[in-house]
Amino acid sequence: MIGRIRGLLVEKQAPEVLIDVSGVGYEIQMPLTSFYELPEIGLEAVVFTHFVVREDAQLLYGFISKQERALFRLLIKTNGVGPKLALTILSGMTAGEFVACVERDDIATLVKLPGVGKKTAERLLVEMRDKLKSLMEASVGSEREFMLQSNYTAPVVANTAEEDAIAALLSLGYKPAQASKAVSAVYVDGIDSESLIKSALKSML
């Protein structure tokens, strides 16, 4: 089990990052809520990971805190929720917002997330309610740790903020037309990719 990775952030293209650890590059998929908190390319980062082995692939999912990883692990135990949908849920809302949805029985907000239908939302509310109590108790005094040390500068591939934002939304399961419309609606000159993604996601929830 690979539970934690610390190394140089070499590539950063939502929702995936590449972290170099002693010459070995680890591709890690992250929810956008964690992705936003990463340092700039060329700096050192620490992420907590969940390792998945499938017949056709070995995948790493990364999180900025142990508590976010714990919530991800609870989500994928819910009937009908796999790692991809769990990432989509945690990309569309913070852990705190998800907990609030469960506490309020807020199906209307959950079904706005791509891939979450009414039945899945109902299962999430029922199955997660008791599980979240223990998680939130463990979250008291939680730490967010990532380190920013290095003079290394990695090459950056040029992409416009709009292209980055649309690509990120598509990776979460939104349709091309939905992604383009949402990004165009909130785009302003000079906005960076991460702010544009946040605004576009917020406009769809």
Curated annotation (Swiss-Prot):
This is Holliday junction branch migration complex subunit RuvA. Belongs to the RuvA family. Signal peptide: none annotated. Residues 65-143 are annotated as: Domain II. The RuvA-RuvB-RuvC complex processes Holliday junction (HJ) DNA during genetic recombination and DNA repair, while the RuvA-RuvB complex plays an important role in the rescue of blocked DNA replication forks via replication fork reversal (RFR). RuvA specifically binds to HJ cruciform DNA, conferring on it an open structure. The RuvB hexamer acts as an ATP-dependent pump, pulling dsDNA into and through the RuvAB complex. HJ branch migration allows RuvC to scan DNA until it finds its consensus sequence, where it cleaves and resolves the cruciform DNA. Gene3D superfamilies: 5' to 3' exonuclease, C-terminal subdomain, DNA helicase RuvA subunit, C-terminal domain, Nucleic acid-binding proteins. Residues 157-205 are annotated as: Domain III. The keyword Kinase does not apply. It comes from Shewanella piezotolerans (strain WP3 / JCM 13877). The lineage of its organism: Bacteria, Pseudomonadati, Pseudomonadota, Gammaproteobacteria, Alteromonadales. Residues 144-156 are annotated as: Flexible linker. Residues 1-64 are annotated as: Domain I.
